[in-house]
Regions:
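Type III/flagellar secretion export determinants
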Residues: 1-231
């Protein structure tokens, strides 16, 4: 009945609101910790820390502790946090669960996701951090597909990739510091030099007339951190 539906909606609303407010509070705390971390570590130290933290949620190290990670629950009685941790574990194991699970961190910004992925305070379970990393990878891949299509269009129209390089540089500058630290030190400067050069890859005989633009695009992306999550 209509009354029953209204009651059900009323019953679920507080839970949804509580879930959002709990995550918002945790994200604010994570952002504060990230800001303090970024101020105390050099770029090199930040990159090393990032790689160490990523090894906890991907690769052989993660797989070796898979059973432990899948059974991990937050040290709390909060039903919202317990449910989210369970959802994250179901999501990272979705290949064996018909792929119907939703990522609890879907739709968060890259900065918010990074603040979860690289938070080693114990606020989030390993699988929650992995789920956040997977969402970040999805967003990165979607951006790459879009920018590559734009790059090919630019090349076909003008013979150049200048606007592509600008897009990549803008994207890099928007990344959290701990993600920027995983790129080569001269990554931004190299992009800026390409932008300043405004090179035409079809007409410049000295540097690769009719050079395949995809090889240039792929070479540039190879310098970025590899996505960490196995299929």
């Amino acid at each position: 009945s209509s009354a029953t539906e209204n009651q059900n909606a009323a019953d679920t609303q507080p839970s949804t609101t509580q879930s959002i407010s709990t995550l918002a509070r945790q994200l604010a705390d994570s952002a504060s910790r990230a800001e303090a971390r970024d101020k105390t570590l050099t770029r090199s130290e930040l990159g090393d820390k990032a790689r160490r933290l990523l090894s906890q949620i991907s690769g052989d190290s993660y797989q070796a502790g898979k059973a432990k990670h899948d059974s991990e629950v937050p040290d709390t009685n909060d039903p919202v946090l317990l449910a989210r941790a369970k959802q994250a574990t179901e999501f990272v194991n979705r290949s064996s669960n018909n792929g119907k699970e939703k990522n609890p961190f879907a739709g968060l910004s890259r900065e918010q996701l990074a603040n979860i992925v690289y938070d080693d305070s114990g606020t989030y379970t390993v699988n929650e951090r992995r789920a956040a990393s997977m969402e970040s990878d999805i967003q990165e891949e979607a951006w790459r597909v879009k920018v590559c299509a734009q790059a090919m269009d630019e090349y076909n129209r003008t013979g150049k990739l200048t606007n592509f390089f600008k897009s990549v540089l803008d994207h890099f500058k928007e990344l959290p510091a701990i993600e920027q630290a995983q790129y080569p030190k001269d990554y931004a400067a190299d992009l800026q030099s390409k932008i300043d050069l405004d090179f035409n890859y079809r007409t410049h005989q000295a540097e690769g007339k009719d050079k395949d633009p995809m090889s240039l695009i792929e070479m540039l992306f190879e310098q970025s951190p590899q996505q960490t999550n196995e299929p």
